[in-house]
């Protein structure tokens, strides 16, 4: 019996699923429990190898530590965590917070070495460590960690997230699909990762002219305003109501394909094996992009990308020859590389190959 500690974020959680599939295939007797942030607790339950999901509320608890202590919520979590003695505890995240949770549980703790994780101090909580190069994609890094900790081999060319769609919450049913549909995943974290709003509106027009209905989800008030702006004046664009992860998974599963920025929901689309065009400006998809079949990454051709910065510091003229002398009509300028017409052409091409 193995405990996985991977508490967040959505993309990181989804990156762990292929390793769970590998282990299940190699070790038929294996059973996983999983500690995860309460907002993402639906995801592990979709995998048949995960027996128990243990929600943790670190994000919420940090906002009021005194209240958390007084209402005994942390003590209840600790009691559940320590209710089982695990054969192995794998910290698949490599942060101090995940290392602390790993040590708090009962079992031999495993993690990545201090030279190969984001917060090296986390290794103080481990009994044993393994080194996996930073140059590997996040999915491969977790797969290697699991295979070495549990002593099995896997085929790196075969990728299976193992999601059983019948386990996705049936109460989030969305009805029958009517015609062709594409999902726009426009919401993300950093300002620099946002594709220009005008581009989304133009892309929505192209999509509906091609006979597609466009579905636009949102998660925050700011994202809702952007979704409504994308849909403005176009009856074939539907701004979805507030959804659970299960609801979003159902919409993605039912669609013909997805167009996304660098966002956790893009990784969900990849896990559901849905054709997805992902747009990358300041980030590097080679290390943490959508991973799997039917995935296409459109990277910026600016030579300052990927800068991995939350604030754009571009001041020109350090650009590739293709854009030398351009003033850039969009912000951030790295997204000038891929406009709506090209994105739609690439999307249709991907659908044709899938």
Show where each model-derived region lies.
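Catalytic machinery of carbohydrate-active enzymes
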Residues: 1-354
């Amino acid at each position: 019996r193995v405990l996985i500690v991977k508490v967040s974020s959505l993309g990181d959680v989804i990156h762990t699923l292929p390793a769970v599939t590998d282990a299940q295939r190699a070790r038929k007797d294996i059973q996983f429990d999983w500690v995860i942030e309460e907002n993402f607790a639906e995801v592990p339950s979709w995998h048949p190898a995960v027996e128990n999901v243990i929600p943790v509320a670190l994000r919420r608890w940090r906002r009021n530590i005194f209240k958390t202590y007084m209402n005994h919520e942390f003590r209840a979590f600790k009691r559940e965590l320590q209710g089982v003695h695990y054969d192995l505890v794998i910290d698949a995240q490599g942060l101090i917070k995940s290392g602390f949770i790993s040590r708090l549980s009962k079992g031999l703790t495993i993690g990545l070495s201090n030279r190969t994780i984001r917060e090296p101090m986390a290794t103080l909580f481990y009994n044993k460590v393994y080194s996996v190069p930073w140059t590997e994609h996040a999915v491969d890094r977790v797969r290697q960690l699991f295979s070495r900790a549990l002593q099995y081999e896997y085929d790196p060319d075969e990728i299976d997230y193992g999601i059983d769609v019948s386990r996705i919450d049936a109460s989030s049913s969305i009805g029958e699909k009517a015609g062709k549909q594409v999902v726009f995943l426009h919401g993300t974290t950093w300002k620099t990762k946002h594709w220009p709003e005008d581009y989304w509106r133009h892309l929505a027009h192209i999509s509906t002219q091609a006979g597609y209905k466009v579905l636009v989800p949102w998660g925050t008030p700011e994202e809702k305003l952007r979704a409504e702006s994308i849909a403005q004046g176009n009856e074939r664009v539907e701004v979805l109501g507030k959804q659970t992860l299960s609801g979003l998974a159902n919409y993605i599963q039912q669609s013909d394909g997805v167009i996304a920025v660098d966002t956790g929901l893009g990784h969900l689309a990849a896990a559901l094996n849905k054709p997805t065009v992902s747009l990358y400006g300041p980030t590097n998809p080679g290390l943490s992009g959508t991973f799997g079949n039917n995935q296409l990454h459109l990277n910026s051709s600016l030579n300052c990308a990927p800068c991995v910065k939350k604030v754009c510091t571009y001041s020109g003229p350090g650009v590739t020859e293709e854009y030398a002398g351009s003033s850039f009509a969009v912000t951030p300028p790295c997204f000038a590389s891929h406009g709506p017409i090209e994105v739609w052409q690439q999307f249709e091409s991907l659908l044709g190959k899938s």
